[in-house]
């Protein structure tokens, strides 16, 4: 007997897929398997839990049982999938197995932990469960080091600073948000973080961590060292591809899918942070929403093809919020930047003076949707 559509994962992508399937078909069997509790929470809220004084349990929006009842699902929480037998269409754990008609991998992404001595001392905040394990140490910590000055690193740095903690950010790059935009566009946020008291140690290499009586001793390049109470790894995410790799699926940066979200095995699909679409991994909410809508149609034999319009990425740094869109990392763009008291507008144009990317901040974010319409993709 088949378990119908089997979904591995229970995060935002998996839940959006379930909701879209149930809008179209109330009867088709749906089975979800995940290693966590499968309770619903809003993952972006993890960037603000410290300043809000929240505990991990405070984030829960809906229990797994309520979700299963609402959408008529079979759930298997706290279950580690050990293998996918693609030839026989079986998903296996150490004490169970499920036969699928179609399988969806919504396995998300895992935090990158720099390979340095003492790396086991680093905390991560990529899930409610991870925050639950770290919350006591983080709330008690007075001195916090954040490894990584990207999107999550900047959000956490501002949040910890707003909570009254002494915050240091270490990053190899010469500017914050270096993977998202040029320094001309990120300098306003960089200045604001410094103004708030965040100590930015850019162009700096982390060399090791050691627990001492006074805290965690952090060794840096050029024979520098600092001591902190907690270290948070925010150096990026890596798509979780291990199950897909063992199943013989095509892997690049993520699990490679076509415009139907189908992997190299026609019965297996991938969705969310683990999926690589047109050579790109898109770990943002809007592409996941659109992907879930498209995939629900394909799983129900209604041909759907994913077409992604230009989309906004929001940097949730409350004291200086940013929106960006387009290919902000293109080397051939000329940036026209207008900075005023009420905010910044940075436009990246190509040799033909066509708008290819933009960044807006603060009150100027209201111009984002008009600029989106002008973007040439």
From Swiss-Prot:
Q: Does the keyword Cytoplasm apply?
A: yes
The terms under GO molecular function for this entry are: oxidoreductase activity, acting on iron-sulfur proteins as donors, NAD or NADP as acceptor
Gene Ontology terms: cellular component:
cytoplasm
The record's EC number reads 1.18.1.-
Q: What cofactor is this protein dependent on?
A: FAD
Principal subcellular localisation of the protein:
cytoplasm
Q: What InterPro entries is this protein classified in? A: FAD-bd_OxRdtase, FAD/NAD-bd_sf, FAD/NAD-binding_dom, NO_rdtase_NorW, Rbx-bd
Cross-referenced Gene3D superfamilies, in alphabetical order?
3.30.390.120, FAD/NAD(P)-binding domain (3.50.50.60)
Pathway-wise, it operates in: Nitrogen metabolism; nitric oxide reduction
According to its UniProt record, which reaction does this protein catalyse? 2 reduced [nitric oxide reductase rubredoxin domain] + NAD(+) + H(+) = 2 oxidized [nitric oxide reductase rubredoxin domain] + NADH
* General function of this protein: One of at least two accessory proteins for anaerobic nitric oxide (NO) reductase. Reduces the rubredoxin moiety of NO reductase.
What family name appears in the similarity comment? Answer: Belongs to the FAD-dependent oxidoreductase family.
Task: Tell me what this protein is called.
Answer: Nitric oxide reductase FlRd-NAD(+) reductase
Q: Which organism is it from?
A: Klebsiella pneumoniae subsp. pneumoniae (strain ATCC 700721 / MGH 78578)
């Amino acid at each position: 007997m088949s378990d119908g559509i089997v979904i591995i994962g229970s995060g935002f992508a998996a839940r959006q897929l379930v909701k879209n399937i149930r809008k179209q078909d109330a009867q088709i069997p749906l089975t979800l398997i995940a290693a966590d509790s499968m309770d619903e929470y809003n993952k972006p809220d993890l960037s603000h839990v410290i300043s809000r004084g929240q505990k991990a349990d405070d984030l829960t929006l809906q229990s797994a049982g309520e979700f299963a009842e609402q959408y008529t699902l079979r759930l298997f929480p706290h279950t580690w999938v050990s293998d996918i037998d693609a030839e026989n269409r079986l998903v296996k754990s150490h004490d169970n197995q499920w036969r699928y008609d179609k399988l969806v991998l919504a396995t998300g992404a895992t935090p990158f932990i720099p390979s340095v001595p003492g790396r086991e001392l680093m905390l991560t905040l990529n899930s409610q469960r991870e925050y639950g394990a770290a919350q006591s140490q983080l709330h008690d910590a007075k001195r916090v080091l954040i490894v990584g000055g990207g999107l999550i690193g900047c959000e956490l740095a501002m949040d910890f600073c707003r909570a009254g903690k002494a915050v240091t950010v270490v990053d190899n790059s010469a500017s914050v948000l270096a993977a998202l935009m040029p320094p001309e566009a990120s300098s306003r946020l960089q200045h604001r973080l410094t103004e708030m008291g965040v100590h930015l140690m850019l162009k700096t290499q982390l060399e090791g961590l050691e627990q001492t009586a006074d805290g965690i001793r952090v060794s840096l390049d050029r024979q520098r060292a600092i001591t902190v109470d907690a270290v948070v790894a925010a150096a990026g995410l890596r798509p979780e591809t291990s199950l897909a790799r063992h199943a013989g699926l095509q892997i690049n940066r993520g699990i490679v899918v076509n415009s139907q979200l189908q992997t190299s095995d026609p019965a297996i699909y991938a969705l969310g942070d683990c999926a690589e679409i047109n050579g790109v991994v898109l770990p943002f909410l809007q592409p996941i929403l659109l992907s879930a809508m498209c995939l629900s149609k394909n799983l129900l034999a209604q041909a759907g093809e994913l077409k992604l319009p230009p989309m906004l990425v929001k940097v949730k740094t409350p004291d200086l919020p940013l929106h960006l869109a387009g290919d902000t990392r293109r080397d051939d763009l000329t940036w026209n930047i207008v900075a005023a008291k009420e905010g910044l507008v940075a436009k990246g144009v190509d040799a033909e003076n066509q708008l290819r990317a933009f960044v807006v901040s603060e009150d100027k974010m209201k111009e984002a949707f008009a600029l989106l319409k002008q973007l040439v993709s």
